[in-house]
Design a protein with these regions (language model features):
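Conserved donor-binding/catalytic core segment of Leloir-type glycosyltransferases
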Residues: 21, 156, 203-219, 225-229
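Carbohydrate-associated surface elements
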Residues: 161, 182
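A short helix/loop element that forms part of the nucleotide-sugar donor recognition site in Leloir-type
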Residues: 189-203
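A short, well-ordered alpha-helix in the C-terminal region of glycosyltransferases
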Residues: 237, 351, 358-372
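Nucleotide-activated donor-binding/catalytic signature segment of Leloir-type glycosyltransferases, i.e.
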Residues: 250-277, 285
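Acidic donor-binding loop of glycosyltransferase active sites
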Residues: 270, 281-299, 314
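Short hydrophobic beta-strand element within catalytic cores of glycosyltransferases
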Residues: 306, 311, 315-318, 328
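Conserved acidic donor-binding segment of nucleotide-sugar-dependent glycosyltransferases
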Residues: 327-342, 351-357
Length: 392
């Protein structure tokens, strides 16, 4: 799920890399998807070519001591495009003398790019995620994002859907390239044993649909619970395992308790990162029927959980939101549904749970696709090429 475990002793790309200063508000040990995205990228680059500038956070000293590259911590727990952050960044660029400055999230920290390049001569690049796409609907934020595009040489996007919207906001002022999230394919794989998780929650050998994510409305756990009576009508032994914490937990619990199939819906609560692979492996099908909310302001830019599930060998039911459909090859590795419609969600999940041999075949196809397109090694190889082009 967002902020999931990284592979230990990650293999690094050994070709000559561009030296990079990563400036980011989002970095471990703080949890989160952007944090893990940045971490998984930099830890696979040659350590002598990377320096990270990130906020202070509880446990940062211990975390930093275990990393092979240098991490410089800002005095506070948040980094915004203030004069102080810009000044400290300029000083660090002058000390480190990187080939390129890269922002872990282009907005809003990318607003200091102009000053950095003007005062140091070092070009800048930035990663984009969901927020940069979402702000395209807000006039002031859209203008600021266009300014960032004019001050950097490269913006990356995690999906083709996101890239199209970033390109629209960039207005041709910089290159926009695809750089999806990767998956630690050695951590999430079909050989992981989910038996202990099944035993813990009394799932036995029943067919299980698992959903791993934060419990927030956009992710669609509510539609899964609403759909579950229809699923059980077709597959009487079917169980739903909802994994993760979040502010929607109480409401979801009330929904499940009032359902006629309440005994077939299970919540795990928050799970340690190292146990997430086993929770995926406890399922036969993965579903997260995400949906876009708030007039496009709340959406799924890609959805790394879909890739983690596929890496584990599960067929995926994804919601039609943002770039999420790009994680599925329709009919081959899973299916895409309208996450607003419980009936459509129920039909897709029940069809897979009712035919587990077909579900396993789709899961195997998903695993092969992850290995070919979404391994961190493949993603970092692409990143190195993009950084080299941006630094010239």
């Amino acid at each position: 799920m967002d902020g999931g475990p990284s592979a230990t002793a990650a293999p690094r790309i050994e070709s000559r890399a561009v030296s990079v200063l990563l400036i980011t508000n989002d970095f471990p040990p703080r949890a989160g998807g952007i944090q893990q995205y940045c971490h998984n990228l930099v830890r696979r680059l040659p350590p002598g070519e990377v320096v990270v500038y990130a906020p202070a956070w509880p446990g940062a000293a211990e975390f930093d001591a275990g990393e092979p590259y240098r991490v410089v911590r800002h005095p506070t727990s948040r980094m915004l495009p203030t004069a102080d952050v810009a000044r400290r960044s300029v000083e660090l660029v002058r000390e480190v003398r990187p080939d390129l400055v890269c922002f872990g999230a282009a907005f809003p920290l990318g607003l200091i790019a102009r000053r950095l390049t003007r005062e140091t001569g070092v070009p800048c690049a930035g990663f984009t995620h969901g927020v940069e796409v979402a702000v395209s609907g807000v006039p002031l934020a859209r203008r600021l994002m266009t300014r960032v595009a004019g001050d950097v040489r490269l913006l990356t996007a995690v999906s083709r859907w996101s890239a199209a919207r970033v390109e629209k906001g960039a207005r041709g002022r910089c290159a926009v390239e695809l750089l999806p999230s990767g998956v630690a394919a050695g951590v999430y794989h079909p050989g992981v044993d989910g038996g202990a998780v099944r035993a813990r929650h009394g799932l036995g050998d029943d067919p299980v649909c698992v959903c791993v994510s934060r419990l927030v409305p956009r992710k669609g756990q509510d539609r899964l619970i609403e759909a579950w009576p229809q699923v059980v009508a077709r597959v009487p032994a079917a169980r739903l395992l909802i994994v993760g914490p979040g502010p929607y937990r109480r409401k979801l619990g009330r929904m499940a308790a009032s359902s006629p199939v309440a005994g077939r819906v299970h919540f795990t609560g928050e799970v340690p990162w190292e146990e997430l692979p086993a929770h995926y492996a406890a399922g036969d099908v993965f579903a997260m029927p995400c949906r876009t909310r708030w007039l496009g302001m709340d959406l799924e830019a890609l959805g790394v959980v879909f890739l983690e599930a596929a890496a584990t060998g599960l067929p995926v039911v994804a919601g039609r939101s943002g770039g999420a459909p790009e994680t599925v090859v329709e009919g081959m590795t899973g299916t895409v549904v309208d996450g607003r419609r419980a009936g459509e969600v129920a039909g897709a999940v029940a069809e897979l749970l009712a035919d587990l041999p077909r579900a396993r075949a789709m899961g195997a196809a998903g695993r092969r696709r992850v290995e070919a397109e979404f391994s961190w090694e493949a993603v970092v190889s692409r990143l190195e090429k993009l950084l080299a082009e941006a630094s010239r």
